[in-house]
Amino acid sequence: MSVPQIQVEEVAGGEEGPAGTTPPPDDHLRSLKALTEKLRLETRRPSYLEWQARLEEQTWPFPRPAAEPRGSGEEEPSLLRTRALRPHPPPNGRANQDDGHPPTGKLEGFESIDEAIAWLRKELMEMRLQDQQLARQLMRLRSDIHKLKIEQTCDLHRRMLNDATYELEERDELSDLFCDAPLASSFSLSAPLKLIGVTKMNINSRRFSLC
């Protein structure tokens, strides 16, 4: 009997998994990928690079399918074969064998291919949900960082405006002290007198001390 093929894209299209969970309506993972491509971000962590190198150098025990199409009975999904190599918990429920359909094959930890496909679909759905949650957290973190930068910039500009306002007020106060228009150089007062607030209008009414 031919082995059924697994369509991963159909699983993410709104089909509920065994746990009854559905992917979120907003595709945060796609938004994160688009933002990553727009900003041209690349992962340069040593752990990720080492993992990528080991993955590329790893030799798979199963041969890859040829380029030309083969019959459905000879073609087996590579994702299922790769996933079957990983340790997985034994399934809780057993496949019903009394429905008249004998098991097509026996995998390690599974009674039938259908049971393995159901477990694989559940694992894929959980992985997609985790990816969506991580993408949503990263997008929210970027939004929070952007808001903090805006707040810091606004605070800096506010302090600059306050400093400029205080400086203008000081200049206005000083201009009030030296409001008289300058006459000829011979009739103008000296700079020290101006600093202590002496003008031509109040020089006769002010009292001075030599102490």
From Swiss-Prot:
InterPro entries named in the record: FAM167, FAM167_domain
Region (Disordered) residue spans: 1-30, 56-108
Pfam families for the chain: FAM167
UniProt keyword terms in alphabetical order: Coiled coil
Keyword Ubl conjugation tagged: no
Entry coiled-coil feature ranges: 120-153
Homology family: Belongs to the FAM167 (SEC) family.
Protein name: Protein FAM167A
Encoding gene, per UniProt annotation: FAM167A
